[in-house]
Amino acid sequence: MLKVEMLSTGDEVLYGQIVDTNAAWLADFFFHQGLPLSRRNTVGDNLDDLVTILRERSQHADVLIVNGGLGPTSDDLSALAAATAKGEGLVLHEAWLKEMERYFHERGRVMAPSNRKQAELPASAEFINNPVGTACGFAVQLNRCLMFFTPGVPSEFKVMVEHEILPRLRERFSLPQPPVCLRLTTFGRSESDLAQSLDTLQLPPGVTMGYRSSMPIIELKLTGPASEQQAMEKLWLDVKRVAGQSVIFEGTEGLPAQISRELQNRQFSLTLSEQFTGGLLALQLSRAGAPLLACEVIPSQEETLAQTAHWITERRANHFAGLALAVSGFENEHLNFALATPDGTFALRVRFSTTRYSLAIRQEVCAMMALNMLRRWLNGQDIASEHGWIEVVESMTLSV
């Protein structure tokens, strides 16, 4: 099997000053191309360390994606490290120098002398085009390993991987068929509870069940070879049955996007009134393109469930909205949710402890619970479901 590795460079990545989103994206993208990464490393802006790890990984990896260090500043060392590791010098790539000069001229700017460094590549390097930036990429062969050097800017990195590097890999190597990965996301059950229920299922050969907990949700993944797809899809029915009402969506699209599409399909507008969630619902739904109108965030205040229900019913009518959703303030470990619909207003009062999780996580949990209420109503289900450590202490319905 082809051994594909990634090397991230830069002090800011090594010291955790920025999150290495490029590594996460590449690992996921390559996995779905049938190229799962076998190793990831991170090295700072130190020439000796870079040369050492390039030489070391060249003895083990078939392909190494090196990210970062192609800029114009003194701490951008990837080209020099590659040349040093190979025992050769840097040469000026005249065509790329002219392309950079054109790039700056079209934007009404003069190219700084330091940018010339970005056109200096190892003597044996294969040039890789960057259509959206000034940091060209390049490839070199070192021992057994084909190394690709890529810019750290995420938008430039992704374009280069998708349009330049992946075609080269397909041309050079016989790539395996991508694996099958079935995913669903749950809300309201713990990881251990789900695992205890699912561990009794018999997995087909080469198939694994994975769990990813990211409060307040848990993602279940069934991954295996394409040859087992039929058996996996049959097993997936059992997985969904066991997960039961905790399933909130399948795939990777996300709940806000799926709710937004359903609202649009059914021509429902939605108004929001948020206290404890502080605008999280509006943010998540607006990013997904939901048909929102007249959303508000107001200071937290103590309310009975009846007050929240009557208030959101009036708000729906006053704004001529199809639906209206409210999250009250959090007082004495209690909080209200209310959803006003053409069928009536449905409200829940819940209780949960303030000591177990941070404020930010509690806000995320409540936003997810509100979205799940909306999802369940849109699907014709009762708005209340099991939520693990969240206790529903009161419910009410106001007729139309």
Swiss-Prot record:
InterPro entries: CinA, CinA-like_C, Competence-induced_CinA, MoaB/Mog-like_dom_sf, MoaB/Mog_dom. Belongs to the CinA family. This is CinA-like protein. It comes from Shigella flexneri. The lineage of its organism: Bacteria, Pseudomonadati, Pseudomonadota, Gammaproteobacteria, Enterobacterales.
